[in-house]
Amino acid sequence: MIGSVLQKVVAGQILDIDEAMEAMSAIMTGEATPAQIAALVTALRMRGERETEIAGFVKGLRAHMIPVELQLAQPVIDVVGTGGDGNRTFNISTATAFVVAGAGVPVAKHGNRAMSSRAGSADVLEALGVRIDLNPSAVARCVEEAGIGFMFAQRFHPALRHAAPVRRELGFRTVFNVLGPLANPARVRYQLLGVAMPELVETVARVLALLDVEHALVVHSADGLDEISLGAPTTVYEVRRNGTVEVRRWTLEPESLGLERVPSDALRGGTAEENARIVRAVLEGARGPARDVVLLNAAAALVAADAAQSLAEGLELARHAIDSGAALDRLERLKVLSNALAEAEVPS
């Protein structure tokens, strides 16, 4: 199967969803050789990945992931970025996740170790005292009881090990860089998703439209962040399902919400421990650019989760989540519960 897919891609043809799904299954089961994997992702990168291809790869990846089953009736959201923007900001999406949870929206955060910064979400959560090595049942309990849970990508996508050596050796961005945020093990249907590669922002939005998303905001800022930025306008592709799926493009300016524009250098992070201190300071109410960028991203996430009707309303909900102590409380709850569950070794 992988051989026929390769022939088609090399000939310049576009894979449909089923073909891409079968190709990913061949990779996930170890059927595809390293040479075939490298040839496929390189050819796709040179030609440019299409939405049907990425959607099929996501479906193939989901079929081999370890799922997290949530027993919640309300919307559950993920706040995540592709990484790889090279700006080395602190972990904005991680801080944002606690604010969103503090505003009453459950968060099932999917993440990994460092990519574009010196510390990924997994590294920073560890530095904050959260256990990241939880099994599916334990993660579900965290989301349901603490309002937020974390799924460590390496644990929930073990089949990706077949592609890992190729990714390391190639050393350039491939389709795998965008798959993780699209393959949340809890199958969330609401997302704030940052994309580092400007050429893929609209494509990723249209991938979500082909999948089972209900409401998502896909973002990329003009200063290169895979977040909503304080330093430049942010392009937003909004995907909403209401009978039919609509994809709408708009631009977000921080000034429109009364936030001061500051360069992304003001959001620079450091080690996992340094970033953890920044995240905790934001949750404790410290003022400044770090707080403002988290408020801005949390406002967008609350809109994506249908918890706010506008960014202005989302901003007020986010402010209240921090200033009331609710966001910090979610961190403390997750810290206590994740450690207790890890020690108890809740069965999968």
From Swiss-Prot:
Residues that bind Mg(2+) 2: D226, E227
GO molecular function: anthranilate phosphoribosyltransferase activity; magnesium ion binding
Listed Pfam families: Glycos_trans_3N, Glycos_transf_3
EC category name: transferase
Residues binding 5-phospho-alpha-D-ribose 1-diphosphate: 81, 84-85, 89, 91-94, 109-117, 121
HAMAP family in alphabetical order: TrpD (MF_00211)
Subunit composition and interactions: Homodimer.
Descriptive protein name: Anthranilate phosphoribosyltransferase
